[in-house]
């Protein structure tokens, strides 16, 4: 059925953009509320389309905890996006071109549909070989990116990777992880013998006027892996309120009970939220506690940050 597309390559994006410029396309439905789906929502809003987002889960952006994804949902609703949560697509209808999307809860008019429901490893060609695959089809590699067959390497979204915090293998389909692993695999093919130091699932997204970032473990992951943990949420500003145009930042911190070792962090704000996640990523990578990061010598100047940065306000509030 024409008018139903996936967004996988640059060519896909160019084609869809030109298609969406047609005046008869007024209603766009996005299926999937992850990173790609949300970016599509914003793109079509900028093109003046009426946008509907259908998500099978009870919220969007599930890599973030509920408090943060809730802020993203509020931002989308404020810009006129129709959110259809807890709904599953049943079928697309139309003659030649899509005209309607049917879910388990209703029917919606649509002249264009984008399916953005995540990715899975395309490794079917390895079935029946000696290369070990995980349950989701991802290639299992050691920390040198070597598969179960000696001297055969793999890297990218087709693989599991070592998670720095949990010490377990994880499926993290992120460009940063793929680039690092690809570089390391190439070096090891040439005899470098280097090990991947581990990923944290650090990621960021722009949601209209908000920016959001996360790193390390979310609350659900901390519980899943058996951590004894605590959380705290603070609201601060990107720079001091006495300097013009301060904007609010919300930070959620997940840390180990007792030791106060930082396990994960998430941030949301209009400006300056995402880059603060990089500070937390370095801290988690090196096993820092909230006390240590809370007293780290970060920069101060009124245009950029306060004497106590939002990162440190969160850390020092952790008990």
Question: Where do the protein language model's features map onto the residues?
Answer:
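FAD-site-proximal beta/loop scaffold in flavoenzymes
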Residues: 2-24, 100, 107-184, 283
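Residues that mark the start of a beta-strand
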Residues: 16, 26-27, 50, 228
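A short alpha-helix-loop-beta-strand transition element characteristic
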Residues: 23-24, 132-136, 192-203, 228-232
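Rossmann-like dinucleotide-binding cores of NAD(P)H-dependent redox enzymes
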Residues: 27-29, 35-91, 173-178, 195-196, ...
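A Rossmann-like FAD-binding core segment of flavoenzymes
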Residues: 45-143
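A conserved FAD-binding loop/helix module that cradles the flavin
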Residues: 141, 155-218, 303-319
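Flexible, glycine-rich terminal cap/loop adjacent to redox cofactors
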Residues: 209-215, 223-319
């Amino acid at each position: 059925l024409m008018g139903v597309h996936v967004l996988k390559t640059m060519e896909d994006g160019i084609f869809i953009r030109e298609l969406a410029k047609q005046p008869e396309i007024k209603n766009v439905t996005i299926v999937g509320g992850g990173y790609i789906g949300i970016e599509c929502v914003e793109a079509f809003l900028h093109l003046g389309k009426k946008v509907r987002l259908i998500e099978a889960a009870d919220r969007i952006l599930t890599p973030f905890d509920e408090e943060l994804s809730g802020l993203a949902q509020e931002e989308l609703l404020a810009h006129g996006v129709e959110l259809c949560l807890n709904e599953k697509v049943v079928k697309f209808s139309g003659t030649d071109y899509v005209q309607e999307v049917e879910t388990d809860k209703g029917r919606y008019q649509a002249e264009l549909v984008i399916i953005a429901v995540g990715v899975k490893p395309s490794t079917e060609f390895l079935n029946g070989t000696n290369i070990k695959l995980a349950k989701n089809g991802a290639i299992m590699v050691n920390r040198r990116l070597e598969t179960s067959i000696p001297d055969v390497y793999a890297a990218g979204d087709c693989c599991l990777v070592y998670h720095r915090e949990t010490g377990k293998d994880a499926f993290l389909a992120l460009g940063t992880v793929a680039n690092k692993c690809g570089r390391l695999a190439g070096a090891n093919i040439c005899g470098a013998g280097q090990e991947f130091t581990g990923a944290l699932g650090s990621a960021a997204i722009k949601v209209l006027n908000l920016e959001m970032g996360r790193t390390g473990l979310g609350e659900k992951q901390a519980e899943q892996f058996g951590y004894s943990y605590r959380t705290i949420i603070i609201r601060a500003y990107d720079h001091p309120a006495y300097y013009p145009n301060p904007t609010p930042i919300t930070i959620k911190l997940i840390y180990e009970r007792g030791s106060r070792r930082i396990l994960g962090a998430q941030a949301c704000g209009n400006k300056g939220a995402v880059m603060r996640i990089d500070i937390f990523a370095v801290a988690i990578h090196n096993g820092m506690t909230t006390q240590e990061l809370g007293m780290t010598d970060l920069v101060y100047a009124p245009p950029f940050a306060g004497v106590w940065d939002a990162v440190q306000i969160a850390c020092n509030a952790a008990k």
